[in-house]
Amino acid sequence: MLYSKKKEFVKFLEGIYKNANTIVAIHYHGLTVAQLTQIRKDLRVSGARLKIVKNTLAKIAVANLKIKQADIFSGPIAIAYSEDYITVPKVILRFADQYPSLKVVGGFVDQKVATMNDIEQLASLATSESHKGNFLSLLQIPIRRFATVSHAPLVKLVTILKNYVNNKS
């Protein structure tokens, strides 16, 4: 890689480290191209990205931003990143269960080093979509109760009229 390209890539990585709220570093050695492509697709659907990085350039980018560095940049490393806190850990840990050769080595949350335990805790949280769904269902409860209560007198009236008609006949 040319020196100018390396400088561009370091700037690109610095942008990722600044803008992404969650970054998960993985060892991808042993994964097929199809498996990596599937991980990328699943991440892309949820608004996240996967980038294979050169360790030296990743270390330089982290050092330039004065982020405390963990020893995660060794071997074949890819970083999955997103502005969402929960998406990346959920997708990556799901694939780590599915593909034993994929190893999560650490990451960064809000430009601070995250351990495997931190990443697992983030993955166990509910997504914002599920929170929105729960909130909307809570909003519907009073409306449903009102509909049921207002519908009950009509049902009773119809039942009384049916009984009256049946008794007359």
Curated annotation (Swiss-Prot):
CDD domains: Ribosomal_L10. InterPro entries: Ribosomal_uL10 (IPR001790), Ribosomal_uL10-like_sf (IPR043141), Ribosomal_uL10_bac (IPR022973), Ribosomal_uL10_bac_type (IPR047865), Ribosomal_uL10_CS_bac (IPR002363). NCBIfam families: PRK00099.1-1. Keywords: Ribonucleoprotein, Ribosomal protein, RNA-binding, rRNA-binding. This is Large ribosomal subunit protein uL10. The keyword RNA-binding applies. It comes from Orientia tsutsugamushi (strain Boryong). Transmembrane segments: none annotated. It comes from the Bacteria. One of its GO terms (molecular function) is large ribosomal subunit rRNA binding. Part of the ribosomal stalk of the 50S ribosomal subunit. The N-terminus interacts with L11 and the large rRNA to form the base of the stalk. The C-terminus forms an elongated spine to which L12 dimers bind in a sequential fashion forming a multimeric L10(L12)X complex. Forms part of the ribosomal stalk, playing a central role in the interaction of the ribosome with GTP-bound translation factors. Gene3D superfamilies: 3.30.70.1730. GO terms for biological process: translation. Belongs to the universal ribosomal protein uL10 family. GO terms for cellular component: large ribosomal subunit. Pfam families: Ribosomal_L10.
